[in-house]
């Protein structure tokens, strides 16, 4: 399993020969490691409707034929935008696609799609657990800290957790460290920080918070474009 951070909350997860692209905010992302034309996913997972997460998902799926996975409202929206292959689901559900198990889990945030200054339905924000033969990864999406994370850890046992640390709109370093304690992954990778001034954070602070809790978890700090492999 190879996990590449593309900046912000965007990741490429290569698992069991399947390329999974999550929250592809690439256009307009000053830290993006790739452009929309440089990705060729099999699946595109969208956690919620905000522009820095839905991002280029529709355009990428239309260009590549990738399947877009999203909560029901986002899947229907994508279909209306011309995406041919969608998998709609909802929190608590698991689907099997491309040989992988994909589970939608709760995220505490908001979700709207804005078009021409008008808000259209974006459904409920979610996270994902992606599981295959080579391992499992939990992408938390944008979220605050919640006890749901303990259940996510107990039920799905993700080996790698991708967690926002930017604060203001999501957890900060302290809350994200507590999330690590609840989830009990083997590896934690911080995300959703440093893209814009309101979410500037030092990822080393997150690492220190995890260490202060005495957790036997490896914190891997990536630069955009760097990968973690296991």
Curated annotation (Swiss-Prot):
What the entry lists under SMART domains is as follows: Lactamase_B
State the source organism's domain of life: Archaea
* Signal peptide range in chain numbering: none
GO MF annotation list: hydrolase activity
A Pfam family? Lactamase_B_3
Q: Which UniProt keywords apply?
A: Hydrolase
The record's comment on protein family reads: Belongs to the UPF0173 family.
HAMAP family, A to Z: UPF0173
| Record's protein name | UPF0173 metal-dependent hydrolase MK1542
């Amino acid at each position: 399993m190879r996990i590449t951070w593309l900046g912000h909350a965007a990741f490429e997860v290569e698992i069991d020969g399947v390329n999974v692209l999550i929250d592809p905010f690439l256009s307009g992302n000053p830290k993006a490691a790739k452009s929309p034309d440089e990705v060729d996913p099999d699946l595109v997972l969208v956690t919620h409707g905000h522009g820095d997460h839905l991002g280029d998902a529709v355009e990428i799926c239309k260009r590549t034929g990738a399947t877009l996975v999203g909560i029901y409202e986002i899947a229907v929206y994508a279909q209306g935008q011309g995406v041919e292959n969608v998998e709609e689901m909802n929190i608590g559900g698991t689907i099997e696609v491309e040989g992988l198990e994909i589970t939608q889990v709760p995220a505490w945030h908001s979700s709207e799609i804005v078009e021409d200054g008008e808000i259209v339905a974006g459904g409920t924000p979610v996270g994902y657990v992606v599981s295959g033969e080579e391992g499992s990864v939990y992408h938390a999406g944008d979220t605050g800290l919640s006890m749901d994370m303990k259940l996510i850890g107990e039920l799905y046992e993700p080996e790698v957790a991708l967690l926002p640390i930017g604060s203001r709109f999501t957890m900060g370093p302290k809350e994200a460290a507590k999330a690590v304690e609840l989830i009990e992954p083997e590896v934690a990778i911080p995300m959703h920080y440093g893209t814009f001034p309101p979410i500037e954070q030092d990822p080393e602070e997150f690492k220190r918070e995890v260490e202060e809790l005495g957790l036997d978890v490896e914190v891997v700090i990536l630069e955009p474009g760097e990968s973690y492999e296991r």
